[in-house]
From Swiss-Prot:
Protein name (record): Bifunctional aspartokinase/homoserine dehydrogenase 1
Gene name tied to this protein: thrA
Pathway(s) the chain acts in: Amino-acid biosynthesis; L-lysine biosynthesis via DAP pathway; (S)-tetrahydrodipicolinate from L-aspartate: step 1/4; Amino-acid biosynthesis; L-methionine biosynthesis via de novo pathway; L-homoserine from L-aspartate: step 1/3; Amino-acid biosynthesis; L-methionine biosynthesis via de novo pathway; L-homoserine from L-aspartate: step 3/3; Amino-acid biosynthesis; L-threonine biosynthesis; L-threonine from L-aspartate: step 1/5
Family per record: In the N-terminal section; belongs to the aspartokinase family.
Residues involved in L-homoserine binding: 667, 678
Alphabetical list of InterPro entries matching this protein: AceGlu_kinase-like_sf, ACT-like_dom_sf, ACT_Aspartokinase, ACT_dom, AK-HD, AK-HSDH_N, Asp/Glu/Uridylate_kinase, Asp/hSer_DH_NAD-bd
Annotated stretches, region: Interface: 250-470
Amino acid sequence: MRVLKFGGTSVANAERFLRVADILESNARQGQVATVLSAPAKITNHLVAMIEKTISGQDALPNISDAERIFAELLTGLAAAQPGFPLAQLKTFVDQEFAQIKHVLHGISLLGQCPDSINAALICRGEKMSIAIMAGVLEARGHNVTVIDPVEKLLAVGHYLESTVDIAESTRRIAASRIPADHMVLMAGFTAGNEKGELVVLGRNGSDYSAAVLAACLRADCCEIWTDVDGVYTCDPRQVPDARLLKSMSYQEAMELSYFGAKVLHPRTITPIAQFQIPCLIKNTGNPQAPGTLIGASRDEDELPVKGISNLNNMAMFSVSGPGMKGMVGMAARVFAAMSRARISVVLITQSSSEYSISFCVPQSDCVRAERAMQEEFYLELKEGLLEPLAVTERLAIISVVGDGMRTLRGISAKFFAALARANINIVAIAQGSSERSISVVVNNDDATTGVRVTHQMLFNTDQVIEVFVIGVGGVGGALLEQLKRQQSWLKNKHIDLRVCGVANSKALLTNVHGLNLENWQEELAQAKEPFNLGRLIRLVKEYHLLNPVIVDCTSSQAVADQYADFLREGFHVVTPNKKANTSSMDYYHQLRYAAEKSRRKFLYDTNVGAGLPVIENLQNLLNAGDELMKFSGILSGSLSYIFGKLDEGMSFSEATTLAREMGYTEPDPRDDLSGMDVARKLLILARETGRELELADIEIEPVLPAEFNAEGDVAAFMANLSQLDDLFAARVAKARDEGKVLRYVGNIDEDGVCRVKIAEVDGNDPLFKVKNGENALAFYSHYYQPLPLVLRGYGAGNDVTAAGVFADLLRTLSWKLGV
């Protein structure tokens, strides 16, 4: 005997009803089957709404009409698709049921209230009609059917609206029915009868519980719960799209997961099948070929040590504390007795080892009643000051990690807490069962989904996510997007899910949290109407619970740089080649570092100096290892490296500058390069990295252009006038050559910490002597590197090398996941 249960979505319309009948027929070929059905989707909600509206004097007719329509369409569809379907008979039956519903609602309207016994009798009508209709379908297909009346056969004790079945007595009653072996068995879910023979319902998820009870009473070989998902997942796929489908789990794991909010099974459903060691298979009505998830007495040892992550939202936490707690016997008992009398379920408990406080969580909906019960129970203690005023924290959620393997595997809790910490989620309370099968944390309600996602990513080793927003898609930004597109297969092989979720230029912002199409982002951005807005990006991160959002600023904008601290505070990493932020005031410089540290986010700017050369990271590594910079000299501009190299080769200054501009080494207006300000900014960044508290105004700058030269006018006029400087530079080059030296545009930090940017004459022993053609070279003289310096040399200009450096920084944001 197998017991199959089908939920409301599985019998929502004629097509699905017939699919259920097909599944029953297929299973019946392997042995006798018993089936428990829910009401069609939405019907129970309509019945509940009818009662509530009638009590409050509102019009329940829309709900009645909608429910009648659902059944009318169901019957019509079945009659069209199933030969021999008894349409007239069942239409009469359904009409009689709705006539009875309307009659009872009229009585409720006269009373102005609905007794629980009447409430129970109304809200289970949908299940009763489902069974009658399924019996009609199966009989039309030539099957013998026995319908078990749950009110007669299942004895339940408890409240009218939430009863518990006495399995021993119910087993005896069903056995006395002597069901023929060739009959298909049907029973309405959600319903039972009390000792008076009155109808009662089995509470939330009552149909699942009915199926488990029937399986226990029949000592079935298996209980199958057919639903609209393929089985039990490691967490809710709506929260984590890459949640894994579990092949199997133990009864205890299923109990823990369901208790803490997993939607597939209710804890009461598991108790009967676990008691009688009946395997339970979770299957998908829409995908019957899927293997599903098997819940049983033991688990495969090769399975995951952690089976799932679940969450319960909308909780409130009460904390009872005070000197009167310590050493006083029975305080905990009084707390929970008060909750019991108020009929409030306590979801989580935690107590300090000092006995000074005890905290517990209840559903938010019970908060007012719970507080009243606690105030009444401890009235005297609160009045006399033996207890501190009750602390009530609302809008909380409980996140739980569950798995039998946690008992023998070290480090699960550490990973759990580390994931939450790196997502900036504060833990309010912690609880762990003595079985070591689960550990739960209480967090803010708004953090629940993010908490589940980061925990799942940490524990189940799914693809590491980087959600990138690129601001500025010109030279460097465009090259970066091209590199990201080109490297997608490499990233996938490394299990890195790098999505470009947004691109922006000075005119528009284009976003897609699932990732933009990198083949045609230019066309989409050209059509976008939304302007760039920090608030919009922050809302996206919060609304979609993005795990690892990164702002990549490829502009040279001071306005964007001024928003970095806000980005960091809102949970973004910031990666940028833009030097403006790091060369703003020292106050803002410190703000950025504080915001990054406080938010546990990274501010990465390795491309600020040397483009793709690993300058900043190597300097930081040296300083972190205890080294100290004594002095520094470097060629920090690719454009000026190119220009001064061409002067060595005999080219005039004006020709060299024109060629550098044509080759793309300089800015569109070469005056930006020739002013020396770009080199000064880079030198300031290096100086600040070594701990020097300097402002940009503290850098001594010798521009390439002499002060007496008229550099006014547009770019064309400026370029035309450059030939006036050819003789001056030719003379300086000749003088240096006579001394065995060359001209280089150099940034220096001397041993006194003074920073200068100037045209320098360097000899053949200097590491900068041979640097030209757009190369950068940086010579660090330190305690560890002397008398020969640490030299970093390579191309330090160009969109591709800068974009490559930004790409490398992007990958460094993954260290929050890797723990490095």
